């Protein structure tokens, strides 16, 4: 994770608070922006909002009910296509592509039934450490610690005031910056040590929330679902040397193809902002044999060419009915 991702989260929080204050006008404004033109949508989870948890994580959810309502509304003006259909020349009618990042269980349990009901194609970009259950989903563990305590103490002696919802969010964001600096090669030990006063099991959180390999295969068997890749460890590729970055990209493709028995042609850059994705990363994705690659910023799709197919912009779909 990176400063760019942090800025994205702050931006999401700001937008979410604006939604609360101004509903319904902002609701329609937000959807109007998404529905204006052709675009690829970025989602992460399809699950009900948990009011006991924190906004930086909950903002990444859309409820099954909202997803269904959004599809109903978008179907009046847009054609739903898969990434495999995304090629020049562009369709005359505005189109929309649904994509999910990381690989959460609710993509199968909650999102798939909605897409099946309306016959809408979608893509799930799987980070292979998720179904391997080696992913350190620390942001959810941190949320659990902060949400369930009014005060927390870290091993450096700092006492953090978590008495209000806003303070909990502020503490989450502050601790997030500290955690992002933990060494990758000893992350689990460092995280556990830093929160030594609390019961922590990072791998259990992965088993709770991440797709298993059997579940990835179930998704891959759906004619509506395309499985894409998102590296093996959800790392910031821009911080890696050429060979290491290339192996992160290539090995995720190879592992997913081996597990699903299907060709994996589409890639999502982890974090995906301009801070983590440069021209080198675009070239590496193309070199690995992908047909497309998406980023986490941008707007409408107005042009498709060999070059732009590896920097496809996305819009983040936010559930405007969440009670923030």
Predicted regions and their residues:
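C-terminal active-site subregion of NodB/CE4 polysaccharide deacetylases
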Residues: 2-98, 106, 137, 221-222, ...
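Beta-hairpin (beta-strand-turn-beta-strand) motif
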Residues: 86, 101-103, 127-129
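Metal-dependent polysaccharide deacetylase catalytic core of the NodB/CE4 family, i.e.
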Residues: 41, 47, 116-275, 312
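Residue-level marker for buried hydrophobic side chains located in beta-strands
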Residues: 98-99, 227
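Alpha-helical segments flanking ligand/cofactor-binding loops in enzyme cores
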Residues: 113, 217, 282-283
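Short acidic, Gly/Ser-rich segments with clustered Asp/Glu that frequently serve as metal-coordination loops
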Residues: 102-109, 114
């Amino acid at each position: 994770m990176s400063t760019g991702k942090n800025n994205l989260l702050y931006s999401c929080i700001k937008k979410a608070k604006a939604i609360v204050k101004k509903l319904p006008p902002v609701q329609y404004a937000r959807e109007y922006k998404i529905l204006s033109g052709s675009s690829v949508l970025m989602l992460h989870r399809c699950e009900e909002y948990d009011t006991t948890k924190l906004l930086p994580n909950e903002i990444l959810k859309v409820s099954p009910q909202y997803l269904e309502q959004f599809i109903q509304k978008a179907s009046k003006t847009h054609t739903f296509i898969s990434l495999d259909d995304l090629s020049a020349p562009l369709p005359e009618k505005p189109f929309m592509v649904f994509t999910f990042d990381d690989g959460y269980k609710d993509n199968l349990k909650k999102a798939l039934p909605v897409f099946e009901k309306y016959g809408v194609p979608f893509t799930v970009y799987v980070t292979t450490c998720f179904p391997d259950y080696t992913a350190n989903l620390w942001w959810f563990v941190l949320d659990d610690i902060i949400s369930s305590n009014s005060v927390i103490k870290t091993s450096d002696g700092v006492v953090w005031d978590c008495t209000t919802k806003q303070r909990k969010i502020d503490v989450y964001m502050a601790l997030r910056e500290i955690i992002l600096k933990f060494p990758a090669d000893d992350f689990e030990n460092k995280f556990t040590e830093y929160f030594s006063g609390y019961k922590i099991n990072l791998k259990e959180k992965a088993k709770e929330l991440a797709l298993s390999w059997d579940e990835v295969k179930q998704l891959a068997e759906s004619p509506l679902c395309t499985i894409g890749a998102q590296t093996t460890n959800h790392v910031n590729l821009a911080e890696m040397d050429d060979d290491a970055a290339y192996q992160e990209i290539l090995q995720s493709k190879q592992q997913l193809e081996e597990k699903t028995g299907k060709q994996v042609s589409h890639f999502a850059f982890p974090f995906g902002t301009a801070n983590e994705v440069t021209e080198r990363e675009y070239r590496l994705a193309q070199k690995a044999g992908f047909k497309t690659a998406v980023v986490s910023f941008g707007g409408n799709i107005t042009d498709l060419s060999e070059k732009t197919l590896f920097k496809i912009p996305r819009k983040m779909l936010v559930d405007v009915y969440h009670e923030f």
